[in-house]
């Protein structure tokens, strides 16, 4: 069949599947199908596939996982981000997945999760997608030797002497330590959807310093790994109102939170602030007409909260923001 014939066949297939899946499931990401199938039909194509489709990507976000691989797999596979079948590879095409930190503590699967997300990152890149991995306060705590919430199964995953080997792993030369310093950040801004992601959140004062947050976070992490006294200029970063611990957007009254959110979104030039850190056990919470999205749903077994993934997609006029649960999708 000629290339034109293949393209016409592919286009017709996409239209039919789009309508079918929209009626059956209520949602369908035709962009991801087109991207994936176009490359299969035209493997030598050198142009920009994304330029051929109107809305090139969907953004997913998952909050605190806390050492629970089965529950993370369950909700990410339900959302269509990964395969439910071993080895649980990336299935979201050219989408972006943001994990907002706190992979570690409370559960046994820390090492498995870090390796899995690293593999997903590599797999996503092959399809034009990406996996953005952010640092939570618990990653910093483990780097500095604060192991109060470490699950016994996490320690047992290391060969003896397990504690010594775990210290090495979380240091500069360790697998996890090196990964955190080289691949992870504190904040991520998605310009396509106008969304700002991080673990805890930014106060108005820190919003003005947002461009320095990732660099300061890496500096602090490195000091913690070295067990060094942190410099005075980093103390505010680790303070209760700093970027790794701030809970104002989750815990302030509605009026106060909305005032802060309006201030911060204007400063950052974004539409919404997405964060984990403060558990919302009944599901993803939208505050202030969607300016604040709280996505830590306590999905780990230690908390037994709802399992949910945030999904942000585009239409002609706006972003479509949804909470994806197993068996249902809730528009936020």
Curated annotation (Swiss-Prot):
GO terms for biological process: energy reserve metabolic process; polyphosphate catabolic process. Its main location: endoplasmic reticulum. The keyword rRNA processing does not apply. Keywords: Endoplasmic reticulum, Signal. GO terms for cellular component: endoplasmic reticulum; fungal-type vacuole lumen. GO terms for molecular function: endopolyphosphatase activity. This is Uncharacterized protein C1840.07c. It comes from Schizosaccharomyces pombe (strain 972 / ATCC 24843).
């Amino acid at each position: 069949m000629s290339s034109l014939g293949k393209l016409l066949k592919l286009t017709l297939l996409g239209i039919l599947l789009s309508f079918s899946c929209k009626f059956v499931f209520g949602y369908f990401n035709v962009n991801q199908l087109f991207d994936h199938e176009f490359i299969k039909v035209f493997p030598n194509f050198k142009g920009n596939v994304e330029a051929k489709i109107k809305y090139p990507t969907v953004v997913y976000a998952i909050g605190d996982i806390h050492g629970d691989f089965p529950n993370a797999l369950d909700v990410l596979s339900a959302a269509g981000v990964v395969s439910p079948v071993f080895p649980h590879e990336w299935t979201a095409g050219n989408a972006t997945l943001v994990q907002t930190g706190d992979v570690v503590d409370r559960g046994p699967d820390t090492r498995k999760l870090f390796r899995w997300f690293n593999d997903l990152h590599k797999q996503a890149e092959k399809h034009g997608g990406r996996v953005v991995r952010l640092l939570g306060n618990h990653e910093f705590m483990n780097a500095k030797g604060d192991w109060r919430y470490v699950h016994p199964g996490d320690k047992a995953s290391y060969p003896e002497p397990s504690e010594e080997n775990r210290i090495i792993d979380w240091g500069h030369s360790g697998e996890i330590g090196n990964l955190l310093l080289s691949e992870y950040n504190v904040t991520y801004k998605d310009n396509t959807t106008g969304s700002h992601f991080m673990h805890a959140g930014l106060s108005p004062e820190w919003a003005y310093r947002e461009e320095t947050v990732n660099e300061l976070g890496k500096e602090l992490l490195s000091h913690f790994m070295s067990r060094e006294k942190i410099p005075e200029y980093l103390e505010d970063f680790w303070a209760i109102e700093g970027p790794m611990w701030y809970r104002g957007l989750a815990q302030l009254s509605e009026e106060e939170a909305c005032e802060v959110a309006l201030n911060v979104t204007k400063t950052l030039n974004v539409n919404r602030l997405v964060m984990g850190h403060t558990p919302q056990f009944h599901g993803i919470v939208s505050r202030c007409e969607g300016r604040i999205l709280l996505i830590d749903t306590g999905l780990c077994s230690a908390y037994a909260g709802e399992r949910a993934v945030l999904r942000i997609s585009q239409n002609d006029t706006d972003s479509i923001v949804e909470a994806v649960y197993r068996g249902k999708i809730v528009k936020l």
